[in-house]
């Protein structure tokens, strides 16, 4: 669960950096999709314009990644809420059992 949260935050930070300033996001060849997309567009500048239109749009990719990350975060938060409720119920049941055990011990002693 922590890994998914860190993954989501990393993806969100990367998307924000790319959206803010793609040239400052990374150096060439570092594997950053924002930089690679802009480099591919520069390489295709002298080619047929129809070929340049076939490149995927990074904004759609980023928005789908953000949506997936948000869905994952919502599921993680929902899971934490359920886990907390289960823990409280377990503690209450253990507490009730312990109270009855103490009463039984006191009754037997007195």
UniProtKB/Swiss-Prot annotation:
Keywords: Acetylation, Antibiotic, Antimicrobial, Fungicide, Glycoprotein, Hydrolase, Manganese, Membrane, Metal-binding, Protease, Proteoglycan, Secreted, Signal, Transmembrane, Transmembrane helix, Zinc. The lineage of its organism: Eukaryota, Metazoa, Chordata, Craniata, Vertebrata. Residues 24-70 are annotated as: Disordered. This is Dermcidin. Pfam families: Dermcidin. The modification N6-acetyllysine is found at residue 68. Glycans are attached at residues 30, 38. Residues 50-62, 110 form a propeptide. It comes from the Eukaryota. InterPro entries: Dermcidin, Dermcidin/Lacritin. One of its GO terms (molecular function) is RNA binding. One of its GO terms (biological process) is killing by host of symbiont cells. The chain crosses the membrane at residues 64-108. Detected in urine (at protein level). Constitutively expressed in eccrine sweat gland cells (at protein level). Secreted into the sweat at a concentration of 1-10 micrograms/ml. Residues 1-19 form the signal peptide. The gene is DCD. Zn(2+) 2 binds at residues 86, 90. It is found in: Secreted. Zn(2+) 1 binds at residues 67, 71, 100, 104. Its EC number is 3.4.-.-. It is an enzyme of class 3 (hydrolase). GO terms for cellular component: extracellular exosome; extracellular region; membrane.
